[in-house]
């Protein structure tokens, strides 16, 4: 079984969104630079020495800037997989639609998004 390992939410203004979740829920945010497409890492629970959530069942996530050329910009989850190419194949066989090829997220692993059979944008990641 492949677990949910991350969430993502789009933002018109990533600074405003980071400020909101920090004030409302105590989340910690880390602004990444242009080499990571200005992504914002979000920590919702105390991490262990490897940066993974210490609390069972808890996940961390990120915010990304909304873009006119990106489909289905809604809150979504990221599913951890052992072999991203095999998971992409199974996704398509089950009726999903993979959105492009996996991209390397430096320090984390391979990442690709897909639409499920109901039109939800979901992503998968093969950790390093």
Predicted features, each with a name:
Residues 8-57:
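Core segments of cupin and vicinal oxygen chelate
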Residues 35-39, 72-73, 106-110:
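Short acidic/glycine-enriched loop/turn segments that link adjacent beta-strands
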Residues 67-94:
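Mid-chain, well-packed structural core segment of small domains
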Residues 3, 57, 108:
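Exposed loop/turn and edge beta-strand positions of beta-sandwich/beta-sheet ligand-binding modules
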Residues 9, 30-32, 88-128:
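Vicinal oxygen chelate
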Residues 1-20, 74-77, 81, 127-128:
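N-terminal beta-strand motif that seeds the catalytic metal site of vicinal oxygen chelate
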